[in-house]
Amino acid sequence: MKVVPSEKIKPNWWRETSVYQIYPASFKDSNGDGFGDLEGIISKVDYLKALNVESIWLCPIYPSPLKDMGYDVSDYKQIDSRYGTLEDLDRLMKALHERDMKLVMDLVLNHTSDQHEWFKESRSSKTNPKRDWYFWKPARYNEKGERLPPNNWRSYFDTSAWEWDEATQEYYLHLWSVGQPDLNWETPKVREAVHDILRFWLDRGVDGFRLDAINMISKDQRFLDAPITDDRYEYQLAYQYYANGPRIHEYLNGIGNILTEYDAFSVGEMPYVLDTNEILHVVGADRRELTMIFQFDFVDLDLDPNQHKYIEGSWELSDLKKSLKKWQSALLSGGGWNASFIENHDQTRTVSRYLSDSPKYRAYSSKLMALFIIFQSGTPFVFQGQELALANIPRDWPIDEYLDVETQNFWKLFMSGNPSQEEIEKTMDIVNKRARDNGRTPMHWDSSPNGGFTKAGVKPWMRVTNDYKEWNAANQVNDPESPYTFWSKALELRKELKDAVVYGSFELISEEDPSIVAFVRESSTYKLIILLNFTGNKVSYDCPLNLTSYEILLDNYKDFICMTSPVTLNPYQAVLLKL
């Protein structure tokens, strides 16, 4: 069924833009310390402009102890010296704005670092004025008199979500690491401080924000025990109590009112939201909350039913189609807006995870994902290296090369159970497939030592993957057949055909086909068909539309023939057609 856009969807720059996500530590090191920096990003602005992306999202670059690579912020109004200075950020902003590009900052508002002055004050005494800026609770005790956390919530890093503070004899809440205490948004002064941070950056010229874990800021104040859904663990995921809590829309409206004043972009990270109506309450055109959100249906397709990433799950193409239809239909017709993504700093490389990173099909797979992401309704997000078909960490790397706190905490917990060698190998297979580290390895700029990320002889903060000599930017930017060129052309066509791609209708066709994802984007000016073979097999496809009069705009094999059905699609073939 064709889904027609709601009349509430009006032209706006953030609907028409495309966003390139930069993980600064791994993008480009300019000074030879092995750590990416703002000067390195500035040196690659023209590379990004040529890719045809129009907005740049920077992962956190604020001062931080780096317990969670910058998502533990110790000062919201400064730049970490590893990355540069406020003046360097101003120069980056100037370089982008001169090229009609935008800058989006990453704001972490659910929690701070335990080194933030707010938390230092809060933990200093029970009577400190900032004590209620965080969640502090007394201990529970079992029948043996042993001290227990206030409830059984598990952090995202597989420990208790509560940490004991010896000095004040209470626990504080941390949904992430012990170094990331959760802010208490119930306290009005916390909200005032957050609003001040937003205005600080907007007044400086920033064009918008990605808001980390933003649906965690309102929590059920009863702090009930979570149901036991995974009996392997003492502590349990409790998202029903800390995600999308009772005051979430009040808090988001406070943020949205400020963003609206500046016509600013906002995308909220909102895991555990499956109800499209709940999302429309956030991103509806008349809601004044956020402009779009990241929902996780696509990237959670292969998780087990309890959403534990290190248990092997499975997925079918029909699952992806159901999700695509659900979100495209609900938000387009309901006056909301999608953020179209499948890779980021918390996910793995899609050529490895969902398609094929074999030498034969890797480039084709990357190009397929370009059409899938870019031609949906919504604002497309490209993660650094995705345009180069970068793949996951090699399977033979030892666990010591995986530096992420999530991976290390999981492995420590797993090994504490004295697993067999067979269990270790099987679990390592899953870690290699799912670990966040996969998206965080340094960029491949050229075939020089360290892939051009940093100088020869310098040890980068994280190891560069082995295949940088074959898969790098220098090899691709001038190659008309490369993944980079294909992504660039697709992004350029999105701009040229915005009547259909940005503001047109959406229709999923051939819903029962087990191999092909096919959809139509249409306006009064254009009719586009996107055909994607998600399998490693050559497929005969019976298209319900007569393709004989269509023009081929993009084809990752350059051999598609517009003819009456059935048509043939090669393994991982992706075709964009225009009537």
From Swiss-Prot:
Q: Give the encoding gene's name.
A: mal1
- Molecular function via GO: alpha-1,4-glucosidase activity; alpha-amylase activity; glucan 1,4-alpha-maltotriohydrolase activity; oligo-1,6-glucosidase activity; sucrose alpha-glucosidase activity
Please name the Pfam families in this protein's record: Alpha-amylase (PF00128)
Cite the SMART domains for this sequence. Aamy
Q: Which residues form the active site?
A: D212, E269
Q: Which domain of life is it from?
A: Eukaryota
EC no.? 3.2.1.20
Q: Which family does it belong to?
A: Belongs to the glycosyl hydrolase 13 family.
Origin organism is Schizosaccharomyces pombe (strain 972 / ATCC 24843)
Q: Which GO terms describe its biological process?
A: maltose catabolic process; polysaccharide catabolic process; sucrose catabolic process
List, alphabetically, the InterPro entries matched.
Answer: Glyco_hydro_13_cat_dom, Glyco_hydro_b, Glycoside_hydrolase_SF, O16G_dom_2
Entry annotated with the keyword Hydrolase: yes
Q: Which residues form a coiled coil?
A: none
Q: Which PANTHER family match?
A: ALPHA-AMYLASE FAMILY MEMBER (PTHR10357), NEUTRAL AND BASIC AMINO ACID TRANSPORT PROTEIN RBAT (PTHR10357:SF179)
**Top EC class, one word:** hydrolase
Q: Name one GO cellular component term.
A: cytosol
Identification of the protein by name: Alpha-glucosidase
Would I find Hydrolase among this entry's keywords?
A: yes
Summarize induction of expression. Repressed by glucose and inositol.
Where in the chain is the site Transition state stabilizer? D346
Keywords for this protein: Glycosidase, Hydrolase, Maltose metabolism
